[in-house]
A protein has these predicted regions:
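Glycine-rich phosphate/diphosphate-binding loop of Rossmann-like nucleotide-binding domains
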Residues: 6-25, 154-248
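N-terminal alpha-helical transmembrane segments of multi-pass membrane transport
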Residues: 2-8, 18-23, 27-53, 61-64
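Flexible, glycine/charged-enriched surface loops at secondary-structure junctions
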Residues: 36-41, 202-210, 234-247, 342-354, ...
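Glycine-rich phosphate/pyrophosphate-binding loop and the adjoining helix
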Residues: 134-135, 140-192, 199, 344-347, ...
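N-terminal small/polar loop signature for handling phosphorylated ligands or for N-terminal nucleophile
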Residues: 46-60, 223-264
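Glycine-rich phosphate/nucleotide-binding loop
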Residues: 257-356, 363-367
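N-terminal glycine-rich phosphate/adenylate-binding segment common to multiple enzyme folds
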Residues: 47-159, 163-164, 271, 275
Length: 403
């Protein structure tokens, strides 16, 4: 069988630990036998980021802007323990944070539903998509540890050199910590438009929530920009489509989501989306059953898994032990990127391949072949727990029948 041809390369961002192992397995077992795979490769593994002073992350984001579609493996965001483990020059920032800031996009995360795995919340019968603002807030922060006797102020200098000062806290008798965060009106507006456009495309209601009663300038600015754009540009379109935009406070939103009937888009600020996407994914069954795509205002797409590097399984792998690691989210990152590349380049065969690979993956699970995390959740009677590679081989068997 002739391999499916590609016109334009995908930007391929390799990653860390167990997901890096899975990344290669997916390519070897499910992609390269069928596709003449064209990628522009960037190694975002922590060791290489350290070697390049994180320049490789910047280069990969610029390549994504150039080519339009990227697929990214999960990566380590270093903490103090990782500094020691990898002998790092410095505590490098999150690659995702860097890429999202450079692309200024919105992250849409949607659970993958399969028969036999019932959400922990029985009323959730349809997917809840989390739309996460991908710029700013604590992910582009500046922070300091301060010593007793210090005074922390927020200072803004305008274009004429005039300073506006606000006292944050007087640390006269104690040590402490401070943090500065920011966002841009333009980025918030892009986020709002991306959410409203996605809601129209999917024909789903959209919710948005902040804490504007406490954060009367910062969070309230998000609320105001969303409302202004909705009223001026989207209200009539939403009414014609029979969908609605709903704003509430973030704590009220959490309560409403838990008791809801699902099936809508929940727009969240950056940190809220980071946290709530994990909560929603886990409530549906597994964080490894969640698609994630970053969409920029100028139509650039970056697909990734919505979970981490699976450190515990990686250490088992290094000892030569078999792991049963769920590869579905990483697999769907590849299918999402290949499908989008096919759509952009007019390659029907590539689109069909991505569709078939997703069908084969879901079919494998629904026929009872799955990794340990799903086996613990599945209500299917004749289920079989398999290891990481065995699952991908089982998917390949079904893919061959669909091709």
């Amino acid at each position: 069988m002739a391999k499916i041809q590609m016109k334009t390369p995908l930007v391929e961002m390799d990653g860390d630990e167990m997901t890096r192992i899975i990344w290669k397995m997916i390519k070897d077992i499910l992609l390269t036998p069928y596709i003449d795979l064209k990628t522009e490769y960037y190694d975002l593994g922590l060791e290489h980021r350290n070697e390049t002073n994180d320049q490789v992350t910047v280069d990969s984001a610029n390549a994504t802007k150039k080519y339009g579609v990227a697929v990214k493996c999960a990566t380590i965001t270093p903490n103090a323990a990782r500094m020691t483990e990898y002998n790092l020059k410095e505590m490098w920032k999150s690659p995702n944070g860097t890429i999202r800031a450079m692309l200024d996009g919105t992250v849409f995360r949607t659970p993958i539903l399969v028969k036999g795995i019932t959400p922990y919340i029985p009323t959730w019968t349809k997917p809840i998509t989390i739309a996460r603002h991908a710029y700013g807030d604590i992910y582009k922060n500046v922070e300091m540890q301060v010593k007793a006797g210090s005074k922390a102020e927020l200072v803004c200098t305008d274009k004429d050199g005039k300073e506006t000062r606000e006292l944050i806290y007087d640390f006269s008798n104690e040590d402490g910590i401070i943090q500065g965060v920011h966002n841009r009106d333009e980025s918030i507006a892009s986020f709002a438009k991306a959410c409203f456009n996605y809601a129209l495309d999917m024909k789903k209601d959209i919710w948005f929530a902040t804490k504007d009663t406490i954060s009367k300038k910062y969070d309230h600015r998000f609320k105001d920009i969303f409302q202004e754009i909705y009223d001026n540009e989207y209200k009539e379109k939403f009414e014609a489509a029979g969908i609605e935009y709903f704003y509430t406070l973030i704590d009220d939103a959490v309560a409403r989501v838990i008791r809801s009937n699902s099936g809508y888009i929940w727009a969240c600020k950056n940190y809220d989306g980071d946290v709530m996407s994990d909560m929603v994914a886990t409530a549906y069954g597994s964080l490894a059953m969640m698609t994630s795509v970053l969409v920029s205002p100028d139509g650039v797409y970056e697909y990734e898994a919505a979970h981490g590097t699976v450190q515990r399984h990686y250490y088992k792998h290094l000892k030569g032990e078999k792991t049963s690691t769920n590869s579905v989210a990483t697999l769907f990152a590849w299918t999402g990127a290949l499908r989008k590349r096919g759509e952009m380049d007019g390659l029907d065969d590539l689109i069909k391949f991505a569709d078939n690979l997703e069908k084969a993956t879901i079919q494998t699970i629904e026929e009872g072949v799955m990794t340990g995390d799903l086996a613990a959740l599945s209500t299917l009677e004749n289920k079989q727990k398999v290891d990481t590679e065995e699952f991908l081989l089982a998917v390949n068997e079904r893919l061959q029948k669909l091709m």
